[in-house]
Every structure is written in structure tokens, then in C-alpha cells.
Amino acid sequence: WNLDGVDFVTGVNNPTYKAYIDFASANGIEYVILDEGWAVNLQADLMQVVKDINLKELVDYAASKNVGIILWAGYYAFDRDMENVCRYFADMGVKGFKVDFMDRDDQYMTAFNYRAAETCAKYKLILDLHGTHKPAGLNRTYPNVLNFEGVNGLEQMKWSPASVDQVKYDVLLPFTRQVSGPMDYTQGAMRNASKGNYYPC
């Protein structure tokens, strides 16, 4: 979790995320993503929060520091109760969702992206469509859609370093993928180095 010299155990808990919020506030970063692990995953129910997270307390703390909270959500859990999830968390003060694992571009998933954008817009929530295909204009219709993954971002270095020449790929991205629209690259996931002189963790 990259926090040294703190008086708490780092992880998916309020003290860790308060430290992230403090950092964001001090450095003019508008949002902090409460990443995977905040909700009880086995039930795929976004209304069940893990015991180490007091979500309302975090949202209020972030608001006091002029930072918004974005919640990571798996696609299935988000889709199965989208209206209630968006209403509930918007009322709490959450600013948006980062939805993940759509992982395909068929008609059903494209329709899901539109439903998610429309529902989030209805509740004035921003949306990061992570784990989805490249953009095709959805963010023009729904400006609350911040970005789309649709790319082998830096997180790829965690599981496929030998098969990806990330440096070469990154140099090409502005001229290939980036032309189609905003991109969720997941920067910061690993160290930046050329293929010949790094070993991923």
C-alpha cells in the first residue's frame, strides 16, 4: 500500500484511505478511488461494505478536504441493482463509480455502458468505464463519462511483463488508442522502465 511510517496497518480500511485523501487534498487531486475490496465481494452486493470501511465517514472526511470519492464496482454487482446503488451512494455524497470487468464489446455490453452512463447522469455521478472497449462517442452524449480503459494499461506489467513491450506500446498509444477518446491507463501500477532493464514484482 506504499505507506511508510504510519501508526496503522495499511490496507482496505479508513486510516489508509484517509491518508490517500490527505495526499489528494494537499496535491490538488480531485478524486480518490476506493478500489476493489471495499464491498463484500462474495455476494456481489454493493450495499454490503466490509467491516474495516466506514463509507459515510470516509465520504464526509473527503468532502471536508475538497476531495470526492469514486467507488470501484464489478460490472455484475453494479448492473444487478444499478438504480438503487446509484441513488443510495449519490445521496451519501459519493461522486461516481469506476466499473470494471465488462471485457467485451458485444451489443449487450455496449447497451450496459449506455445504461450505466444514463443512470449515473440521472444521479449526477461521474463514471469511469474500466475494463471496457475503446470509446465510440458515449462521452459526447453523456459528459459524466470520464474515460474508458480500452487499452493495455500499466497494470499489465503485473501479470504479462514478458509478452508486452510496454515502452514501445506506450509510445504508440497517443497516435493509436488515444485518438478515439479519453483513456483509463491505470498509471502508477508498476515502475516505469524499458523492457531490458526491469523485473516486475
For each feature predicted by the language model, list its residue ranges.
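Aromatic- and carboxylate-enriched substrate-binding clefts and catalytic-loop regions
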Residues: E36-Y199
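Conserved structural scaffold segments of CAZyme catalytic domains across common CAZy folds
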Residues: W1-S64
